[in-house]
Amino acid sequence: MTSTASDILSVYFLQMQAQNKNLLRVVPLFETLDDLKNANGVMTNLFKLSWYRKMINSKQEVMIGYSDSSKDAGKLSASWHQYKLQEELRSLAKKYKIDLIFFHGRGGSPGRGGGPIQATLKSQPSGTVNGKIRITDQGEVIQQKYGYKPLAEYNLCSYIGSVTVSYTHLTLPTMYTV
């Protein structure tokens, strides 16, 4: 989890010390309620650094965790802070001309970010999907969603369709909604 800018910078520093010529991207994870509240400040401290923006090629992925914040604050409060953070980071990225992609660490239950992908993406703040999103499905739901080929195809189509609808702001006829 990420609490300070140094949590991110130290990983890059270790890669440089190891003389890794192709730096692996480092994705900050904001999951606890305190981390969600402090994330805008953390990312501001990083984005203010011109060499950091250059190092990441003006592309930043940020992971939003669901489980710990729901445990800390309850589902409603956690959801509000996750929503608010995405709005703040969208504005911050725009200010610094950073291409921002949100990475959602979803569990199976609604308290862990689970639920229908269509509803999840419709509920994201405007301008935070932009045709790009990363989502993990936790171990307990992988078999349920992808263990049988027709289900895997259905779920993949649901993800692709939901991102497309969210990005283009299209409204699908009811017969096509899942």
Model-derived features with residue positions:
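Structured, charged N-terminal subsegments at the starts of enzyme catalytic cores
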Residues: 1-27
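Catalytic or ion-translocation cores adjacent to nucleophile or general acid/base/metal-coordination motifs
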Residues: 18-167
